[in-house]
A protein has these predicted regions:
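C-terminal boundary and immediately downstream tail of ABC-type ATPase nucleotide-binding domains
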Residues: 8, 224-252, 283
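Non-catalytic connector elements of ABC transporters
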Residues: 2-41, 45-53, 62-63, 247-375
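ABC ATPase NBD Q-loop/coupling interface
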Residues: 56-78
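ABC ATPase nucleotide-binding domains
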Residues: 79, 85, 89-233
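A position-specific signal in ABC ATPase nucleotide-binding domains
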Residues: 50-51, 58, 104
C-alpha cells in the first residue's frame, strides 16, 4: 500500500510560532533540528493532542484537520500511533495489557488475536505477563512500538525514541527500529536532534529552525546538497567556509578563498550562477581532504586539484580516526578561528604517514568534494 501525507499548519504560542508546510510518502520522514524548533509540537498537532490555529493535515486522502472546513478529528479517530519520548509505558500494566491499551473498544476475542499477532511480529512472544520494569531497553522499545502499531495506524509518530538510551544500545536499537519500520510498511514521522540517527532512519529529512522548515529532501540529497549555510550548520557539517565568486559556470564555480582560487563542481540539480565578486558559502567534508605523501615526488596536477600547503596546529584522537586542524601557509587570519581546515584521517594512515612527527603538509581537494551552498 502506498502512503502520502501532507502537513500545513500554523500554531501561535506566547513565545513561539510554528508555521510549517511539508509532505512525505512511504517510509520514514524525520523531523530534524535543534531543541525548541517545533518538532514535537508538530507531532502533537498530527496526533490531535494540540489544535493548530490554522492549516490542514491530510493522511492518505483522509482529512484529519482543516481549519477552513471546520474539520478536527479527535485523537482516537485519527488512526495515528504515537511512541512517546522515554516510551511512557504503563508500569502497573503487563506487556500484553500495554500493547492492548489502544484496543479497549474492540471485542475481547479480536483484542487478544491482535495483541498475539503484534507481539509475535515484534519478537515479544512469552513476555505477555511481564511488567515494563522487568524488560531490557530493546524490549521496552518494542512494547512501545507494539502499543502504537496494534491499532493498525495510518501514520506512526515517534518522538526521540532512542534519546533515553546509552550510546552502544542506541546504535543497535537504531538498526532494529529501521528494520521494524520498513517491515511494517506504515508511514512514519520521527523526531530527533541527532543527525546520524536522522540519516540512518530516514527516507526523507525535514529540517526545522525556529518554527519553520528550511529544507525538506530525500536523505542522500540533503547530505550532499544542503539548501543553505543555515541547513549545513544545523546538520553539524564541518568546514563551512565563506569566499568570493571568481567565475560561475553551469558545471563549476571558481571561488577565491584565503588567497587561493578553488574550483568546485556546481550543483547538478540547481545550477547556481552568482555574479563575480559575490560572497559565497561552501563546505568541504574533512574526510575528503587528502594529505599528499612526501615520498611520491611532486603532486601531479592531473590527479590533484586545489593544491595548498598548511601546518597542523591542533588534533584530536577519536580512537579509529584522527581529526587534524590545519592552518594554511597564507597571510591573513585563519577562516575558522585559529585554523582553516579540519582534516579527518583513519588511524592507520596517521601512523603510516608519521603525522605525529611531521606537521607540515601539502593538501589536495577534488573539485567534486567542495560543495557550494546557495544563499
Amino acid at each position: 500500500v502506498s502512503h502520502r501525507f501532507s502537513v500545513e499548519i500554523m500554531k501561535r504560542l506566547p513565545e513561539f510560532t510554528l508555521e510549517v508546510a511539508w509532505s512525505a510518502g512511504d517510509g520514514v520522514a524525520v523531523l530534524f533540528g535543534p531543541s525548541g524548533a517545533g518538532k514535537t509540537l508538530t507531532l502533537q498537532c498530527l496526533a490531535g493532542l494540540i489544535r493548530p490555529d490554522a492549516g490542514r493535515i491530510v493522511v492518505d486522502d483522509r482529512v484529519l484537520f482543516d481549519s477552513a472546513a471546520g474539520v478536527d478529528l479527535p485523537p482516537q479517530h485519527r488512526r495515528v500511533g504515537y511512541v512517546f519520548q522515554g516510551y511512557a509505558l504503563f508500569p502497573h500494566l503487563t506487556v500484553g495489557q500495554n500493547v492492548a491499551f489502544g484496543l479497549r473498544d474492540r471485542p475481547r476475542a479480536e483484542r487478544q488475536r491482535r495483541v498475539a499477532e503484534v507481539m509475535e511480529r515484534l519478537g515479544l512472544g512469552g513476555l505477555e505477563h511481564r511488567r515494563p520494569g522487568e524488560l531490557s531497553g530493546g524490549q521496552r522499545q518494542r512494547v512501545a512500538l507494539g502499543r502504537a502499531l496494534a491499532i493498525d495506524p495510518a501514520l506512526l509518530l515517534l518522538d526521540e525514541p532512542l534519546s533515553a538510551l546509552d550510546a552502544p544500545l542506541r546504535r543497535s536499537l537504531r538498526d532494529e527500529l529501521r528494520t521494524i519500520l520498513s517491515g511494517w510498511g506504515t508511514a512514519a514521522v520521527l523526531v530527533t536532534h541527532d543527525f546520524t540517527e536522522a540519516y540512518q532512519l530516514a527516507d526523507r529529512i525535514v529540517i526545522y529552525e525556529r518554527g519553520r522548515v528550511i529544507q525538506s529532501a530525500p536523505r542522500a540529497e540533503l547530505l550532499w546538497q544542503p539548501a543553505s549555510e543555515a541547513v549545513a550548520r544545523i546538520m553539524g557539517l564541518r568546514n563551512v567556509l565563506r569566499g568570493t565568486v571568481v567565475k560561475a559556470m553551469p558545471d563549476r564555480i571558481q571561488i577565491s578563498w584565503r588567497g587561493l582560487v578553488l574550483e568546485a563542481v556546481n550543483s547538478p540539480t540547481r545550477s547556481y550562477l552568482p555574479p563575480p565578486d559575490s560572497p559565497i558559502a561552501f563546505f568541504i567534508r574533512p574526510e575528503y581532504v587528502r594529505l599528499i605523501r612526501k615520498d611520491r615526488g611532486s603532486p601531479d596536477a592531473a590527479h590533484h586539484m586545489n593544491l595548498m600547503r598548511g601546518r597542523i596546529v591542533g588534533e584530536s584522537d577519536f580512537g579509529t580516526v584522527w581529526s587534524l586542524r590545519l592552518r594554511l601557509d597564507a597571510p591573513g587570519p585563519p577562516s575558522q578561528g585559529d585554523f582553516d581546515l579540519e582534516v579527518e584521517v583513519p588511524r592507520l594512515v596517521y601512523e603510516i604517514l608519521e603525522i605525529e612527527r611531521d606537521r607540515h603538509w601539502e593538501l589536495s581537494i577534488h573539485r567534486g568534494s567542495i560543495h557550494v551552498l546557495p544563499t
